[in-house]
Amino acid sequence: IENKLNLIVMDDNDKKRKLKVKSKVRSIHSSLAIEANSLSLESVESIVDNKMVLGDRKEIQEVKNANELYEHINEYNWKNESDFLKAHTLMMKYFEDDNGYYRNHGEEVKKGNEVIYTAPQSILVPSLMKSLFNFITENEKEIHPLILSSIFHYYFVYIHPFSDGNGRM
C-alpha cells in the first residue's frame, strides 16, 4: 500500500509541476503579447524548455528574461519598491539603459497614430509609486490580496512608470 501511495503522490507532484510550467508559459506569452511580442505559445514553451527557436532575437530574449524572473520570483518582496525595481531590471536586461529606473520623460499610449492615454508627468512618478507601495503595505491586512493586487495593477497601469516593459511587469 505504501508503494502505491508513493506512486500517487509522485504522480500528483508531477501533475502540479506540469501545471505550473504550463501556467508560467501562458503568463509569459500573454504579458509579452501585450508588448507586441509575436512569438507563438509553442515558441515560448520551447524557449522555456531551453530549446532552439527561430525568431526575432529581441523577442526571444524577452521570453528568456521573463522566464528568469519567474525562476527567481520568490526572492522578491513585491510590496517593496526596491525589489520591484530590481525585478524590472531583470525583465528588461539587455534592452534599455534605464531599466530598473522610473521614466524621466512623458509617456503616451497610442493606437495607431491616435493617443489613447497620456500618463502622469515623469516628475510625479516616484512619489506616485511610493504612495502606491505605501498603500499596499498599509492595507495588506485589511484588504483581500486579490483585491489589493487588482488595485495595485490599476494604479500601476495608470502611472505607467517605466519607459518600456510596463506590460511585462
Model region roles, listed by residue range:
Residues 1-169:
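FIC/Doc superfamily catalytic core
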